[in-house]
Amino acid sequence: MSEIALEAWGEHEALLLKPPRSPLSIPPPKPRTAVLFPRREGFYTELGGYLPEVRLRFETYGTLSRRRDNAVLVFHALTGSAHLAGTYDEETFRSLSPLEQAFGREGWWDSLVGPGRILDPALYYVVSANHLGSCYGSTGPLSLDPRTGRPYGRDFPPLTIRDLARAQARLLDHLGVEKAIVIGGSLGGMVALEFALMYPERVKKLVVLAAPARHGPWARAFNHLSRQAILQDPEYQKGNPAPKGMALARGIAMMSYRAPEGFEARWGAEPELGETYLDYQGEKFLRRFHAESYLVLSRAMDTHDVGRGRGGVEEALKRLRAIPSLFVGIDTDLLYPAWEVRQAAKAAGARYREIKSPHGHDAFLIETDQVEEILDAFLP
């Protein structure tokens, strides 16, 4: 039997039909935080900003092999966290920040990580870190600026996808990992692409789900509207949180994450419930994410262009041909259409697979049976 469940799927919370969870699970995860760029070194961003110190919040599952050859690095989407899998025990949950608690106890890709699952910790050393600029334990706008003792807030420097990839590479150094299978979806897929181009010698295999090689005008338009909803909130303009703006930003984003087929199937008989659903998602989003991190990361997405400084997108993607790569599109994705992902795969000489789903962009988080089947045919 299946059950209707309201789940926090990392970037996107979705009301969906979810299969019952397997009784086989991993031990309760323990999040950790590492200083990767200490004050004596600092972190200079691609756009000329400076952070005196950079920390990343991360979780690991499994054990690094003696040969250090079984690592899998998973990058989360825009509003995701390091909490990839497992369920926090009560002690760990109480130690989390309010935003982390609001994110939830269960990991955002829990159905893919565990005994007998595609990312089995008995076989792999799985690493998941919260991106630089986010609000779930990594250095971001909520962090204290060591120079002032106050949160960075709106003074946090602008980031690019390449900055996010560089921070993640330093985490692998910290963990003693030389090479890894690299997997990412949506924003995480953009980071995965940049990671592979910046550090090709560190990538055993590359998996890009529902992500483009360049953030084009259509996707940027959605981000622009979401940011404007926040920036135009009168409370935000007074220097306060932006509750109405954040709720509206989430609603705008949700429309790009979903597809007409899914809305019609669920709410065709009662269309007003679709509106209620968007309102609910907006209200819930206020409790689990921060406006400044949303602005920083969405702007970073808009900088994404693998061809920048590399002779154009196609020339850049050709550099990936030495890396076994898999690109996964979604047939109903409005945000990053399947043709866009397919085109990138062709230029990279990569395999291409497509998820069939009425759920749009969110399908890479929802259709985990299909994702598992696709990964099973590609991973060692």
From Swiss-Prot:
It is found in: Cytoplasm. The active site is at S186 (nucleophile), D333, H361. One of its GO terms (cellular component) is cytoplasm. Pathway: Amino-acid biosynthesis; L-methionine biosynthesis via de novo pathway; O-acetyl-L-homoserine from L-homoserine: step 1/1. Transmembrane segments: none annotated. Transfers an acetyl group from acetyl-CoA to L-homoserine, forming acetyl-L-homoserine. This is Homoserine O-acetyltransferase.
